[in-house]
């Protein structure tokens, strides 16, 4: 059923895929990295200005393999991993409407954790997918989407100061598609290599 939905809609909203305890660990990890090894997006390559963002983090690259069978099962595709990218969103940040580059043919965004202040108890900061469907997530939920085809974006993060949301992006290409093998591992020797850090 999910494979048919993905084929028709070009995205899937899946709940409770990543274990909650693992989500807590990743969230604490990302926040600690933000505090001790701050890596902001800056300049012309910035997609979310000043957000702590990391390409090819070793923990995330490990999870790229963990998620692979889930993504293949729900899309019906045979996939090759390309790369990962995680980001800590803070109040006022916006993700502009966009499509992704070839290495993001099949993309997955995972919500690992959040903390909201000065908002209503039912507030959730979600992602829009073309044509304008808002998807909200709890920790462990994932959205699979065709990153090169489906526009996606986030409105301004309107929660209060000290709020955060930790999201990570796990990218793959179809082994039977137009971007394989050229974009395998995002043109790196393999998963985990810290190359092309400016890519998103």
Question: Where are the regions that the model predicts?
Answer:
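Non-heme Fe(II)/2-oxoglutarate
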Residues: 1-75
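A structural signal for short, well-ordered beta-strand segments and their strand-loop junctions
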Residues: 13-14, 80-81, 144-145, 169
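Generic beta-strand or strand-like secondary-structure segments
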Residues: 66-70, 85, 107, 111
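A short coil-to-beta-strand element that immediately follows conserved catalytic motifs
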Residues: 76-85
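Conserved active-site beta-strand element of glycosyltransferases/polysaccharide synthases
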Residues: 88
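Catalytic core of non-heme Fe(II) oxygenases with the double-stranded beta-helix
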Residues: 91-153, 161-168, 173-188
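Acyl-donor (CoA/ACP) binding surface of acyl/acetyltransferases
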Residues: 158
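Acidic/histidine-enriched, glycine/proline-rich intrinsically disordered or flexible terminal extensions
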Residues: 182-200
